[in-house]
Amino acid sequence: MAISKGAINVRSIFIGGEEPCICAPVVGVDAEQVLAETRQISAKKPHLIEWRADFFNGIHDDRQVVATAKEIRTIAGDIPILFTVRSEREGGRPIPLTEEEKMRLFETVCQSGAIDLLDYELVHEPYVATVRQLSRQYGVRLILSYHNFDFTPAKEELVAKMRQAGKYGADIAKVAVMPKSLQDVLVLLQATEEARQELPIPLITMSMGGLGAITRLAGGLFGSAVTFAVGQQSSAPGQIPIEEVKDVLSVIMKYSQ
C-alpha cells in the first residue's frame, strides 16, 4: 500500500511511494565540514540529504552558499538534496538574514540547479506565495513545514497545518512536534493518518525526542513519507542513526505488507 495518495518523483526516488524514505541532515558550520559530512553521509546511501544551511557560517554570502551547494550536489551524485534554512523560533540557529534576504537566497540557490527540494515554514505566511512561485519556476519541490519544540497541539490543529500547506501549493507537508506524554505521540500519529486520508500530497510527520522515537521508525505505517536519521550529526532531538533506522524499517516493511 502506498504511504501517500500522491507520491512524487524526485530524481531516482519516490516520496510517498511504497516505503518511507530516509533523509540525513548535514549540519557543518563551514564548507570543509559540510563537504566532509556529505561524503560520509553519501556513503551510507540515504534516500535524501538535507543541508541545514542555518548552521552554515557563510549563510550571509549567496555566492558562498551556491558554491557549497554545487559541491554537495557533485558529491551526492543522484541523491536528492533538500535545502533548509530553519528559523530560530522553529528550532534553527540564529542567522543574520531578514525574510526578504532569504527570498533572494532561495531564488539564487534554486536557480543554481544544485538542489531538488526546498523547506519553508508556514509561520512566514506573507512570503509563502513568493517561495511557491520561485520553487515552481526552477523545478524545485516545496516542503511547507510547521515545528513546535514546546508541545503537541491538538489533532485538529495538526491536521489543519497540513491542510494549510496543501492549500498553499506545497508538494509535501511537514509537521514536527514535541510530546510531553505517550498520548501526545498518539495524537501525532492520529493526525498523520487523518491527513493521509484527506490530502493528495505526501506528508512528513514526527514526534520528537525520546518519547517520539517510535514515530521515526513506524511513522510510514500511518502516512509519514520521510524519516530523518543521523548520518553524521543530529539536527533535531530523537534522531536515530541511519544504519539502525534502515534495519528497523526493513523489518517493519517486510511484515506489514
UniProtKB/Swiss-Prot annotation:
Active site: 147 (proton donor/acceptor), 174 (schiff-base intermediate with substrate)
Keyword Lyase: yes
Annotated CDD domains: DHQase_I
Keyword Amino-acid biosynthesis appears in the UniProt entry: yes
Enzyme class: lyase
One Gene Ontology molecular-function label: 3-dehydroquinate dehydratase activity
Keywords: Amino-acid biosynthesis, Aromatic amino acid biosynthesis, Lyase, Schiff base
EC number(s) recorded for this UniProt protein: 4.2.1.10
Task performed by this protein: Involved in the third step of the chorismate pathway, which leads to the biosynthesis of aromatic amino acids. Catalyzes the cis-dehydration of 3-dehydroquinate (DHQ) and introduces the first double bond of the aromatic ring to yield 3-dehydroshikimate.
Assembly information from the UniProt record: Homodimer.
Identification of the protein by name: 3-dehydroquinate dehydratase
Lineage: Bacteria, Bacillati, Bacillota, Bacilli, Bacillales
